[in-house]
From Swiss-Prot:
Protein name according to UniProt: Large ribosomal subunit protein uL6
GO cellular component: a single term: cytosolic large ribosomal subunit
Single Gene Ontology BP annotation: cytoplasmic translation
Pfam families (UniProt xref): Ribosomal_L6
First and last residue of the signal peptide: none
Amino acid sequence: MSRIGKLPIKLPQGVTLRGPEEDIVYVKGPKGELSQYIDPAISVTIENDTVTLHRRTNQKRHKALHGLYRVLINNMIIGVSTGFTKSLELVGVGYKASVQGNALDLDLGYSHKIYFVIPPEIKVQAETTKGKNPLVHLEGIDKQLLGQVAAKIKTLRKVEPYKGKGIRYLGEQIRRKAGKTASK
């Protein structure tokens, strides 16, 4: 069996899982509801607040799907019960971030401001402290959507390796390059 796929998933208090109905599993919790398509080769069983996944055959593809869908369902359960957060740090002189409605207003050293529209499923906060780099906090129940939005924001100003200026995840280590040495 798949090492990850064979592990049972414990349902926390207040979280319900139903399905698969027409190959879709629904997870509902205090923070919201999520749904996920499940391949017909994978079966989902729910017993005593424990979810287990089984596969029909031992084909290589089915083994991969077994682990994949177990992790996706586990992420859905964590999302609707506690949620996910990602923080981005804006490193650079004059870099600013503010929230205006459902848009993130960014000043990233370009000649123009950047307005990044945030999906309604994601909550965003901009934090500016004097003497520190501005931070953008993203929060949501869908881990995949949250990561995708954070990655898109990060691509608006990629971190350059010489001075380390740009948008990075909070706590991310950047490989720095040495600049050219002056020749005599």
